[in-house]
UniProtKB/Swiss-Prot annotation:
Organism: Rhizobium sp
Region: L-carnitine dehydrogenase, residue numbers: 1-335
Entry-linked CDD domains: 4HBT
Keyword Cytoplasm: yes
Gene (UniProt): Rs-cdh
Protein name: L-carnitine dehydrogenase/betainyl-CoA thioesterase
Subunit structure: Homodimer.
């Protein structure tokens, strides 16, 4: 169920700005209040990172990006919003005051979520007139990529609010987990705090440097945790005897001196300088923006790997990505066209994302194929071959493609694609697609493709049903009146006339 059409973000820092990106890239208009003088620049940079990451994350058609509006007051920002996300600095009095002000100005049925990392929702909602609609929605950085949100209700939060919050995070491609009882720092940050305290002791006691510690994590158990978490990882460690055997085998270790995390390290100036210097050396001159982009690329790669796991059904965050993509395809706008028009079908309008640009500074090869693939998918949806059709066991498979690259497109350039049907019969579909620069209307690439209608379960070509063929014939007959496009029928290496 989709109920968020307008969102408001109060606070636009690292977390708040990423919430803005998450909402906007889900097609939701966002109004923002942040008194920081450079809030627009900061959020703009977060948006650029998010759009770059999404271009790598999925080939599914995203909805039109939501409109961003920067406001001069909390009251202006929250007016008319369905979901309001508070992300101001982690100070109880400040957060409680901001949330109380939001509550006074917001629509009575608007949800109010707080990004707090550890404050209790009962404390945050104590001065509200409508505390039943306030809850903690604690995300993880970067919010636009990491899907988890811890949903924590306070003493006065209604059950209906948490249920609606679950629907809301699902709408924007996230995974909500409901924490049964409120506790400071919830679940994730309590685990992170335990690990963080032990890590500080290891650096303080000169056991290792920051880079060594990070290497221990990223080359070993960090990889396991990304796809199986803690308990499932240890279940496997118990072998065929399972978790009970593991607990019996390693239980005695709990009494051994293997940790100091219950002792709080003195984070004095000397330790801060030691960690700061080691971290600077580890970064090797990379800026925060560079590190963010490396992180995002790696997260995308992990999610892609998880999407293909579990026999292709997806696992963990990858299964969530697959489900989100299925919804994007189901909600994709169908190309609008008169099937009898004597002109190529205009299918796709897009822009060259920064993630599409290679080391030569222009759009890389496989992205042209992606645009042509999206174009042919648009044509298929036009004749009734959509996701439901594919789920029923039939589809069109591409069996041959010839692409010509005619221009060099830079990041940010607007493109559109057209498709002309050269011929079709009961099983075959022969198309010629062209990508144009939207500013100049010059062709920048063409693709000639042959597709076969198949029974995907039987693994063989079969005739398409009349419901599809009737639409296909109408387009084919209209396009038969067009001239054969330049480049159709060419072979690789053929000299131009």
């Amino acid at each position: 169920m989709s109920f968020i059409t307008k969102a408001a973000c109060v606070g636009g820092g690292v977390i708040g700005g990423a919430w803005v990106a998450r909402f906007a890239l889900a097609g939701i208009d966002v109004k923002i209040f942040d008194p920081h003088p450079e809030a627009e620049r900061i959020i703009g940079e977060v948006m650029a990172n998010a759009e770059r990451a999404y271009a790598m994350l999925t080939m599914a058609p995203l909805p039109p990006k939501g409109k961003l509006t920067f406001c001069k007051s909390i009251e202006e920002a929250v007016e008319g919003a369905d979901w309001i996300q508070e992300s101001v600095p982690e100070r109880l009095e400040l957060k409680r005051g901001v949330i109380t002000k939001i509550d006074a100005a917001a629509r009575p049925d608007a949800l109010i979520g707080s990004s707090t990392s550890g404050l209790l929702p009962s404390d945050l909602q104590s001065e509200m007139h409508h505390p039943e609609r306030m809850f903690v929605a604690h995300p993880y950085n970067p919010v636009y990529l990491l899907p988890l949100v811890e949903l924590v209700g306070g003493k006065k939060t209604s059950k209906a609010t948490i249920e609606r919050a679950m629907q809301g995070v699902e709408q924007i491609g996230m995974k909500g987990v409901v924490i049964a009882k409120e506790i400071e720092a919830f679940v994730g940050d309590r685990l992170l705090e335990a690990l963080w305290r032990e890590a500080l002791w290891l650096i303080q006691d000169d056991i290792c440097h920051t880079e060594t510690l990070d290497n221990v994590m990223r080359y070993s158990f960090g990889m396991r945790w990304a796809q199986m978490g803690l308990f499932e990882t240890y279940r496997i460690a118990g072998g065929e005897a399972g978790m009970r055997h593991f607990l019996a085998q390693f239980g005695p270790c709990l009494k051994w001196p293997w940790t100091k995390f219950t002792d709080v390290v003195d984070l004095d100036d000397a330790l801060v300088e030691k960690i700061g210097a080691q971290s600077d050396a580890q970064a090797a001159g990379r800026s925060i923006r560079e590190l963010e982009r490396i992180r995002d690329e790696n997260l995308v790669g992990i999610m892609h790997a998880l999407k293909s796991g579990n026999g292709g059904e997806g696992w963990g965050a990858g299964k969530l990505l697959a489900d989100f993509e299925a919804k994007l395809w189901a909600n994709a706008r169908k190309p609008e066209a008169d099937l009898g028009d004597v002109k190529p079908l205009r299918i796709l309008d897009t822009k060259v994302s920064a993630a599409w640009v290679d080391y030569n500074g222009h759009m890389t090869e496989h992205r042209y194929l992606q645009v042509f693939g999206d174009t042919s998918d648009g044509v298929l949806r036009l004749i009734g071959v959509d996701l439901d059709y594919v789920r029923d066991g039939h589809s069109y498979y591409t069996v041959e493609t010839h692409i010509r690259n005619l221009g060099d497109e830079a990041s940010g350039e607007a493109l559109y694609s057209t498709c002309q049907i050269l011929s079709s019969d009961e099983k075959r579909l022969h198309i010629f697609s062209t990508i144009y620069n939207a500013a100049t209307n010059e062709a920048v690439a063409t693709a000639e493709q042959m597709m076969l209608h198949v029974d995907s379960k039987a693994g063989k070509a079969v005739a398409a049903p009349e419901a599809v063929l009737s639409k296909l014939r109408a387009i084919t007959e209209a396009h038969a009146q067009l001239q054969t496009p330049d480049g159709a029928g060419r072979f690789v290496g053929q000299k131009r006339a």
